[in-house]
Amino acid sequence: MSKKILKDVSRNRKERPWRERKLENLQYAEYLRILNFKKANRVKECGEVLRFVADDEGRLRLYQTWFCKSRLCPLCNWRRSMGQSNQLMQVLDEAHKQRKTGRFLFLTLTAENASGENLKQEVRKMGRAISKLFQYKKPAKNLLGYVRSTEITINKNGTYHQHMHVLLFVKPTYFKDSANYINQAEWSKLWQRAMKLDYQPIVNVEAVRSNKAKGKNSLIASAQETAKYQVKSKDILTNDQERDLQVVEDLEQGLAGSRQISYGGLFKEIRKQLQLEDVDAHLINVDDDKVKIDEVVREVVAKWDYNKQNYFIW
């Protein structure tokens, strides 16, 4: 009797991409092996066996597996992004309950491209600068809370574009007058000062509006942008092995010890109030699928078949 291929479907009937992420994970693990990273075997074993509970309608919920938690692992990053997005939406909902008149802004902060050699230094510099930015008088007087994430994109010439996405929660007085409102040019000058740059950096700021009548509102879109992958898998797995190996080596070293996402002000306080723990500690329970399995009728075990390149039910 042939084994069935795993099919794990979300609440909105979209199949979860276990196979795609595992194939990417194996390619990443192979690059680590070639580069002589000690964690290569550990990464390869990520998510080999998935244990689910199922109800009488066949709905699955992951309850046990082992994730490598490597920063660039496509399988872990997929779970991590879901968990971060889920946590962030909880924080935003609570923030709006506590400060109903608060408004949201989406701020993107950039700097000149970095080489692989100085990427780590530039990422750390941005982390220090953003704390300084929000201590300046004009941003601080209306800022209630924020969440920021660092994203790295890879340029065709082998350099890296490091930038930050910041979701700000501000008092309504931010929009009152020129003494409170900070336009894009001012944000650029403030960021230049915080980063100690000899050029004016490109920044983008826009008000975030919740318009549920038009489907996905801009607050949800901004939250998802903030909580997304630090580095997209397609940027490090291009089938150009020489190029990919250099990128993996640069990013492994450049991102070591850095925080992908962090909270400040009211958002940080709310995370403590909600007792939200580090997402990496809970890559199993990250789903935003609220369908509760009321009656577990069986366990479903799926194992990765290295020959057939897929998960099969055992």
Swiss-Prot record:
Q: Name one GO molecular function term.
A: DNA binding
What keyword terms does UniProt attach to this protein?
DNA replication, Plasmid
The reply on keyword Iron-sulfur is: no
Q: What pairs make up the disulfide bonds?
A: none
> Which regions form coiled coils?
none
Chain positions recorded as DNA binding sites: Y229
Q: Does the keyword Hydrolase apply?
A: no
Q: Which Pfam families match?
A: Rep_1 (PF01446)
Q: Which GO terms describe its biological process?
A: DNA replication
Q: Which residues form the signal peptide?
A: none
Instruction: Tell me, in a sentence or two, what this protein's role is.
Output: Produces a single-strand nick in a specific site of the plasmid, and this nick results in single-strand replication by rolling circle mechanism.
Q: Which family does it belong to?
A: Belongs to the Gram-positive plasmids replication protein type 1 family.
The name this protein goes by in its record = Protein rep
Native organism is Lentilactobacillus hilgardii (Lactobacillus hilgardii)
User: Corresponding gene?
Assistant: rep
